[in-house]
Structure formats: structure tokens, C-alpha cells
Amino acid sequence: MAGRPMDIRQLQYLAALAREKHFTRAAQACHVTQPTLSGRIRQLEQELGVPIVERGQRFVGFTPDGVRVLKWAHTILDNWSSLQQEIEALRNTSGSLSGHLSVGVIPSALPMAGLITKAIRDHHPAVEMTVLSQSSIDILRNLEDFAIDVGLTYLDNEPIEGMRSEAIYMERYCLLVRSDHPLARASSVTWAEAAKEPLCLLTPDMQNRRIIDRAFRSANSAPVPRLETNSVINLCANVHLMGLASVIPEYFLEVMGPISDVRAVPLSDPLVEHSVGLVAVDRDPVSPLVLAAFACAKITEPPAISRRS
């Protein structure tokens, strides 16, 4: 091996290149010139003695060795960030943390995420947060790749291995219809009855949609939605504007507030419910910000309609 020893900045440049998949954009994200970023990555390749990046006229991807180096880079950078948070916490006698927390959230849990981030903000006002709407599969992948710090997702529907978790609420479902719909005043509606309505649903890549599809199958129904979207807000808008019906979590309107001319009717036969909670990679030591997020999740009061039984 030759050249000066590897440093954190080189790993940050490498992580930025993986994220942006473009040398110039990666350099801009790191606030350096493109030649500087490219040169430091070449130095890293020389230091490790392996090619990391496949180069052509533009960024092509990572070599097999580069994929392994990138995984280690993410691990080292995450540990470096956790160390900085730990030292900051030791210096700050008030117990209030600072830093950046990235949260991945399944679309149906975005209103609940607002309650949790409010609790974090109340207890740690200097913490900056990024909240991203993601599928449950993307949340687990991004946690493993250190792209996010914590996720808010389903705990009991599809396997989550190697994760620590904290259950927050039970997701139950209702049929959302316009107030002039014949079912708007019903006390409840069966899944078989809901299947007969013109539906708008989340896209099939969303775990919420897979849950809903299974519920319909258990009621011997297989509706074909008129519209699909990856946004729960868009579902509500299409119920209000187009007169479609949709299936959403019962708690949603309780947190977001009533929507004009829209009614939520509980779904039954079968009763479907799933646990939703906070997840993070199960490792030791745990970063102070992740611990703070879990502590705030524990004290966050879910809406009465979705509290854990």
C-alpha cells in the first residue's frame, strides 16, 4: 500500500458518490470540486490496493471489491457519527442532543411519525430531522445500508431480522367514502362489501397494500382498483374529488383532522390489525440519537382508536 493513510473525508466522498451516482453531484454535495473528490477516491484505491469505482465517460458503478469497501465505509461513517453524538452528549450537561436524525416511514404511518418527531423536537430542540416516505422493504434496506437511522414500519406482518424494535400502535382499517355515499352512515362495512366499490389503493410495492389484498382474499374478493398511488394523502384527495372509495388506517383522520365531505367507516369481517413501531439496526453501541428516538417513541401517546390492546 502507498500514499497517505485513509481518512474520514475519503469515506464521506465515497458514500456521496454511492448516493448521487454522479461525480459532479457528489462533489457538490460535499462542497468540493469534482477533481478533488475524484482524486481523493483514487488515493483511497491506491491506499487499499484495489479498484473501487468502475469508470467510463461517467460513473458506471462499483467493482465487487468496491461494494465491500462501500459497506465498510458506511459502517465506519455511522460509527464516527455516533461517536460525535456521544462526545456531544457528554459535553452537554442539559441532556439535550444535537445532530441529524434520518427517519424512513411507511406512507400509512406518516401522521404518527409527526407525533414522534414532535416529541423528539420537544426534548431535543437542536436535533435536525429528515423524514422520508418509503416502503417497508426500502426501510429495512436503507437501515442496513446506513442510509437512514430509524424506521417506522410494520413489526408483525413480514420478517424484520437483526433489528431492535418498539411497538407504538395497532393499525386497523376503515373504508373511506364521500359523505353522500350510501355507506357513509353505516356503523361498519365488511371487506366483501368494500370490494364492490370503485377503489383507489396504495401501489402493490407497499406492505399496506399487501395487507389489504390479503384481507380481501380472506373475504373471497379480489377487487381491481380504479386508481393506485404511493401517497395516502392522494387516496384521500381522490375520495373527496372523484367519489372513489379507499381503505386507510382508522387513526389517520384522528391525527390529520376531518376532511370535508369524507366519512370513515370501520371495516370488519374479518377484523384486520397489525403492529406498527420504530425499528433500528440492533447493534452495540447504539447512537445517542437512535436511543433518543426510541425513548420518545415510548412516551408518544397514539390516538385512542389505535392504541395497543
Q: For each of these PLM feature ranges, what is it?
A:
Residues 1-5, 71, 89, 123-126, ...:
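C-terminal effector-binding regulatory domain of bacterial HTH transcription factors
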Residues 109, 135-148, 154, 205-263:
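Hydrophobic hinge/microswitch elements
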Residues 45-67:
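A short LG(V/I)-centered, amphipathic sequence patch enriched
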Residues 34-35, 39, 95-124, 128-141, ...:
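N-terminal winged-helix
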Residues 112, 154-155, 177, 183-184, ...:
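Secondary-structure junction motif
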Residues 162-199:
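Flexible hinge/capping segments at coil-to-helix
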Residues 15-36, 59:
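Short helix-boundary/capping micro-motifs
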Residues 3-5, 75, 93, 115-119, ...:
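Short beta-strand-centered segments that line the small-molecule binding cleft or hinge
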